[in-house]
């Protein structure tokens, strides 16, 4: 019985952690997926955005109690506007995607949705972390030494 309890505690302590990209690995992946220069946004800005939104973690989520929405994945894409989690009141789902798809280690769906986000008038300014940490700053460090 004691062994079962210990095993249960061990299993409870295991957290699901998605892929956490290395900076240059992410830069190369985003370039391959067509984000470098997309809508005039440099690759360095995309990598900066991902750093400050999720710490490059594909499984990152953040609940927003105000509107009962959740931000998902490497770009922290919001369930109120962009994806469907089946829980957010009045969700729009402009990317026509399940929010869970934004948590995959393969970030192709997240990139496709991010491209949809920046086609809106706010562009990359839709992300608060980009405005706070990347906008009007030298972001070249985010791709420096990556060969991209």
Swiss-Prot record:
Residues 19-148 form the C-type lysozyme domain. GO terms for biological process: defense response to Gram-negative bacterium; defense response to Gram-positive bacterium; killing of cells of another organism. Lysozymes have primarily a bacteriolytic function; those in tissues and body fluids are associated with the monocyte-macrophage system and enhance the activity of immunoagents. Keywords: Antimicrobial, Bacteriolytic enzyme, Disulfide bond, Glycosidase, Hydrolase, Signal. Residues 1-18 form the signal peptide. Belongs to the glycosyl hydrolase 22 family. It is an enzyme of class 3 (hydrolase). GO terms for molecular function: lysozyme activity. It comes from Chlorocebus aethiops. Lysozyme C is capable of both hydrolysis and transglycosylation; it also shows a slight esterase activity. It acts rapidly on both peptide-substituted and unsubstituted peptidoglycan, and slowly on chitin oligosaccharides. It catalyses: Hydrolysis of (1->4)-beta-linkages between N-acetylmuramic acid and N-acetyl-D-glucosamine residues in a peptidoglycan and between N-acetyl-D-glucosamine residues in chitodextrins. It comes from the Eukaryota. It holds the Pfam family Lys. Monomer. The active site is at residues 53, 71. This is Lysozyme C. PANTHER family: LYSOZYME C. Disulfide bonds join 24-146, 48-134, 83-99, 95-113. Its EC number is 3.2.1.17.
């Amino acid at each position: 019985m004691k062994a079962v309890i210990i095993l249960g505690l061990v299993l409870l302590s295991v957290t699901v952690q998605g892929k956490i990209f290395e900076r240059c690995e992410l830069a190369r992946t985003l370039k391959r997926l067509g984000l470098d220069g997309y809508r005039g946004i440099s690759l360095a800005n995309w990598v900066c955005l991902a750093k400050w939104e999720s710490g490059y973690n594909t499984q990152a989520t953040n609940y927003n109690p105000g509107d009962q929405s959740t931000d998902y994945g490497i770009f922290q894409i919001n369930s109120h506007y962009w994806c469907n989690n089946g829980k957010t009141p009045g969700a729009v789902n402009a990317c026509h995607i399940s929010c869970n798809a934004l948590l995959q280690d393969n970030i192709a769906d997240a990139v496709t949705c991010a491209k949809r986000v920046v086609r809106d008038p706010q562009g990359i300014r839709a992300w608060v972390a980009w405005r706070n940490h990347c906008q009007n700053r030298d972001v070249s460090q985010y791709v420096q030494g990556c060969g991209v």
